[in-house]
């Protein structure tokens, strides 16, 4: 395969390539297509799937397998041509075969390529680091979280229902005096103040006592999921059976022994202080990284093809699909449950996809300007980390992850570390 011509078009980041595919490569592709398609071809005098290639070509023409063989060749041919031209293709707009014969074929491709962006003033970026001071209030907040996790619900008889209680109720709803589907339940546990029910529903239970029967009036939101109930006023008959409130444990040495391996409250607070300190440090470091990333994206100059955002969003959807499959789920079921289509799912990742693309391009620009190189030692170290993380043999990792791809990733990581090292942290 060889690049015959590479012409830059008027549109930004657009090129037209003319590529030649040699006879040997094309012939191998034709043979692959023949072996795949012969299984479904019926030729008189031969068992199905057993007709020789030259017989099929004589009956249907010598070019019978050419179209599919060219399709088979396009990906590798474009990859090699782009490599020779020193460009990275992000999308193929058009493909046009020029001529084909047993000596090979030529084609033209209109492509969009990854831009070579500009960036300046990236060394000495100023960022502000969040406070990592551990106060007594923060430690107390952690203790309250643990108390909440170890709480229990107890029946309350001596007061009216209030927010954060669980009300055990029967309810039945009516619109224009008629009961509607899904509007009735018995012994339903409703946490008051949760906002899980129609606006105004929970608020009207607050103040009532166990054993009371009463009626409340609410209005369904205009965007309610059930079309027939949108914007409608409804009455609900309520029977309040029970009020349950959260009972929190006392904070003392016995509580500490129940929830940790410490013996005293002071020891437990000291441990929590260390935990909070680490969390605050991690959060502060992550926030610094985010600030640096945002500044780099702001400094980026150049026009980014929409295809790059689109490709990244598609990749994120594929990653999400793999996570679902690892949990025994599938994308179709998930979308049905969430009430969304493929475009809506992809749209969820649009903003994050744009950030990833911009940051990557910014760091690639930094790497170019700083002449960052990746050594064999760098690659070996990265392969070693990956092998350890995935519990795989290093040689298997090297086969799965091409050195060319890993080199780009390591180069980008080096660029990011350089910018972080030179950042001014206040």
Regions found by a protein language model. Give the residues of each.
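Extended, charged alpha-helical "arm"/coiled-coil substrate-binding scaffolds
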Residues: 1-70, 80, 139, 172-174, ...
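Core FKBP-type peptidyl-prolyl cis-trans isomerase
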Residues: 29, 33, 143, 154-208, ...
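Short beta-strand elements
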Residues: 46, 88-96, 184, 329, ...
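Extended, domain-scale alpha-helical bundle/helix-rich regions
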Residues: 65, 71-117
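Phosphate-interacting basic helix/loop segments used at nucleotide- and nucleic-acid interfaces
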Residues: 88-96, 145-165, 347
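Short, conserved beta-turn/loop elements at beta-strand boundaries and strand-helix junctions
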Residues: 100, 114-116, 176, 243-248
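Residue-level marker of beta-strand positions
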Residues: 104, 110, 166, 213-215, ...
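Acidic/polar surface patches and capping/hinge elements
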Residues: 127-151
């Amino acid at each position: 395969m060889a690049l015959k011509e590479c012409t830059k078009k008027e549109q930004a980041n657009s090129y037209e390539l003319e590529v030649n595919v040699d006879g040997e490569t094309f012939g191998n592709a034709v043979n692959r297509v023949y072996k795949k398609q012969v299984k479904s071809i019926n030729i008189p005098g031969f068992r199905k799937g057993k007709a020789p290639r030259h017989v099929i070509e004589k009956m249907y023409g010598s070019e019978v397998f050419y179209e599919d063989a060219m399709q088979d060749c396009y990906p590798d041919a474009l990859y090699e041509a782009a490599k020779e031209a020193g460009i990275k293709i992000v999308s193929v707009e058009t493909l046009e075969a020029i001529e084909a014969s047993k000596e090979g074929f030529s084609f033209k491709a209109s492509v969009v390529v990854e831009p070579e962006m500009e960036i300046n003033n990236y060394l000495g970026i100023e960022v502000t680091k969040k406070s990592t001071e551990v106060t007594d209030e923060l430690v107390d907040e952690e203790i309250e979280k643990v108390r909440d996790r170890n709480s229990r619900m107890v029946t309350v008889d001596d007061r009216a229902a209030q927010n954060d209680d669980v009300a055990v109720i029967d309810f039945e709803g009516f619109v224009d005096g008629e009961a509607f589907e899904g509007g009735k339940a018995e012994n339903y546990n409703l946490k008051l103040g949760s906002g899980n029910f129609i606006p105004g529903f929970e608020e009207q239970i607050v103040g009532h006592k166990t054993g009371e029967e009463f009626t409340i009036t609410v209005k369904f939101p205009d965007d309610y999921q059930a079309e027939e109930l949108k914007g409608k006023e409804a009455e609900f008959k309520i029977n309040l059976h029970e009020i349950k409130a959260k009972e929190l444990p006392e904070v003392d040495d016995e509580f500490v022994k129940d929830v940790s391996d410490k013996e005293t409250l002071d020891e437990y607070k000291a441990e929590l202080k260390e935990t909070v300190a680490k969390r605050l440090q991690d959060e502060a470091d992550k926030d610094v990284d985010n600030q640096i990333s945002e500044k780099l994206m702001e400094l980026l100059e150049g026009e980014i093809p929409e295809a790059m955002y689109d490709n990244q969003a598609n990749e994120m959807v594929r990653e999400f699909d793999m996570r679902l499959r690892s949990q025994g789920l599938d994308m179709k079921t998930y979308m049905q449950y969430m009430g969304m289509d493929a475009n809506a799912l992809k749209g969820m990742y649009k903003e994050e996809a744009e950030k990833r693309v911009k940051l990557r391009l910014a760091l690639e620009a930094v790497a170019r300007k700083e002449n960052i190189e990746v050594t064999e030692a760098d690659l070996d170290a990265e392969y070693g980390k990956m092998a350890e993380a995935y519990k795989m043999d290093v040689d298997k990792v090297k086969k799965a992850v091409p050195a060319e791809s890993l080199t780009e990733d390591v180069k980008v990581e080096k660029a990011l570390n350089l910018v972080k090292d030179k950042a001014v942290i206040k």
